[in-house]
A protein has these predicted regions:
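Structured C-terminal cap/extension of enzyme domains
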Residues: 59-61, 89-209
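Glycine/proline-rich, positively charged
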Residues: 1-103, 107-108, 114-120, 127-128, ...
Length: 209
């Protein structure tokens, strides 16, 4: 059972959606009764809510938390958008408490499979036989605390590429991680509009839809 969109609208939205109406207490009881096997939440937005819910882990015993994690957001999420939180912090906080992570946006809304030509050349020079996207999927899947990595697949080629990447998964080495972090630093030199096409900001009050 996933509590979706935690953090959007801040603490007030979380309390109105899940606490004041008794929904969270109900779900905790349902899990205790065995009718819900796993209970967790997906985090979007306000870090205060994320930190609060993790501080309640002893009480709620979260079975998983879904976070946005990729090699660009690892250290640059806040740089891209001040409302974001770096994935390094999010994953680290889950690890401290032994909470498994489900990874969303491993390709950052497709941006990590559609990168600048200089970045494509850099990745291809290193591993000519690998797709650009596979680097991001290997990064997301290499962390020991990751339960699963979500992938939005439009075409059969996407599925086949994912199967090549994960069956079996070759976790990144420390040197490969450094290579990707350097790649992320280079990507930040080519600024783009920080849009994941998630449409969470729509309808836009300024009409930019």
């Amino acid at each position: 059972m996933l509590l979706h969109g935690i953090g959007m609208g801040g603490m007030e939205a979380y309390e109105n959606r899940y606490v004041k109406n008794g929904i969270l207490d109900f779900l905790l009881e349902e899990r205790k009764a065995g009718r819900i096997r796993n209970l967790g939440f997906s985090y979007h937005g306000d870090i205060e809510v994320f930190d609060y819910l993790l501080s309640k882990h002893d009480e709620y015993q979260w079975d998983f938390v879904q976070i946005q994690l990729n090699y660009l957001d690892w250290k640059h999420a806040k740089e891209i958008n001040p409302r974001n939180t770096d994935a390094e912090y999010l994953y680290g906080e889950l690890q401290k408490r032994g909470i498994p992570a489900i990874i969303m946006e491993p390709l950052l809304g497709g941006r990590l499979s559609n990168v600048h030509d200089h970045i494509v050349a850099r990745l291809k020079q290193r591993e000519p036989g690998r797709s650009v996207a596979s680097w991001a999927f290997r990064f997301a899947g290499s962390f020991p605390g990751v339960l699963t990595v979500l992938s939005g697949m439009t075409y059969m080629e996407h599925l086949q590429d994912n199967l090549r990447t994960y069956c079996p998964l070759q976790p990144l080495t420390e040197e490969e991680n450094r290579f990707l972090f350097d790649t992320a630093d280079l990507m930040m030199q080519y600024p783009t509009i920080p849009c994941n096409d998630c449409k969470y900001c729509m309808p836009c009050p300024y009409g930019i839809d």
